[in-house]
């Protein structure tokens, strides 16, 4: 079974980015709180953070390429 891709609103993205800026990892309790406040499922917030960490890692690799 697959799930449909989530389209986040501008407000949701802004809040998720703010949260990510504060901490790259969320505790389960905080994740549930964020999900509830943004009207998202816990799993959507979890996956967004996983993807955002990978995006950050990629940006850092591009900025500092291996010699």
UniProtKB/Swiss-Prot annotation:
GO terms for molecular function: DNA-binding transcription factor activity, RNA polymerase II-specific; sequence-specific DNA binding. One of its GO terms (cellular component) is nucleus. Coiled coil: none annotated. Residues 1-60 bind DNA. Keywords: Developmental protein, DNA-binding, Homeobox, Nucleus, Transcription, Transcription regulation. Its main location: nucleus. The keyword DNA-binding applies. It comes from the Eukaryota. PROSITE patterns: HOMEOBOX_1, HOMEOBOX_2. It holds the Pfam family Homeodomain. The keyword Transferase does not apply. It is found in: Nucleus. Belongs to the Antp homeobox family. Labial subfamily. Sequence-specific transcription factor which is part of a developmental regulatory system that provides cells with specific positional identities on the anterior-posterior axis. This is Homeobox protein Hox-D1.
């Amino acid at each position: 079974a697959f799930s449909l891709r989530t389209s986040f609103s501008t407000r949701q993205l802004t809040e998720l980015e703010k949260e990510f800026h504060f901490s790259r990892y969320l505790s389960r309790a905080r994740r549930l709180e964020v999900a509830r406040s943004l009207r998202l499922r816990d799993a959507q917030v979890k996956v967004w953070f996983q993807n955002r960490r990978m995006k950050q890692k990629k940006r850092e690799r591009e900025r500092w390429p291996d010699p």
